């Protein structure tokens, strides 16, 4: 009797463990596919915690929205905690319960209802403790160089003989993440037009 129960236990562990790992990895693969960086994940009980950093989308909130959409497309059957990073420092913790994920997949609720019912908090300590022992950072941003062009428009109304003084500039910049919280930026300003 003991042999059968031990073999049944080992069989169930061998069958369920790869599915749990595969579901967490499907989230990280989806996040990597949309260009997120500094991805780490950990599974604790009924929750998968994933950290990510948005360096692709200009708006932080658009990047978070794209990450949530990508996670909704994955085959996760547990609750999700997403931690949004900025320069490798945690900023937001987004909680997506498994019931919310299942209702969205079964088309019982819309994407707007998911956004309305998910939990958002600036308290990231509990989530970061869950991933502090994660193996490695996937798609790290350290020492990667980003080239960005910033357009600039200045309007000033401080003289009596002209209605406005203006300047139009292009400012290309090279940005590189160095370490947690550290970033190097080099920028040159090219004037295009001015009066």
PLM features: what roles do these ranges have?
Residues 28-51:
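Short edge beta-strands and adjacent turn/loop segments
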């Amino acid at each position: 009797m003991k042999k059968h129960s031990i073999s049944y236990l080992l069989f169930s562990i061998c069958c369920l463990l790869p599915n749990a790992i595969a579901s967490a990895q499907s989230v990280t693969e989806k996040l990597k596919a949309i260009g997120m960086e500094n991805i780490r994940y950990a599974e604790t009980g009924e929750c998968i915690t994933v950290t990510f950093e948005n360096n692709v989308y200009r708006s932080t909130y658009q990047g978070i929205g794209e990450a949530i959409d990508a996670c909704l497309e994955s085959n996760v059957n547990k609750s999700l905690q997403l931690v949004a990073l900025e320069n490798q420092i945690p900023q937001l913790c987004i909680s997506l319960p498994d019931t919310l994920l299942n209702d969205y997949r079964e088309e019982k609720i819309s994407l707007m209802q998911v956004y309305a019912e998910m939990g958002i908090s600036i308290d990231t300590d509990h989530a970061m403790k869950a991933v502090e022992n994660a193996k490695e950072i996937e798609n790290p941003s350290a020492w990667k160089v980003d080239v960005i062009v910033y357009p600039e428009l200045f309007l000033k109304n401080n003289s009596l003989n002209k209605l406005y003084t203006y300047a139009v500039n292009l400012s290309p910049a090279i940005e590189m993440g160095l370490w947690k919280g550290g970033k190097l930026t080099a920028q040159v300003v090219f004037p295009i037009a001015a009066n």
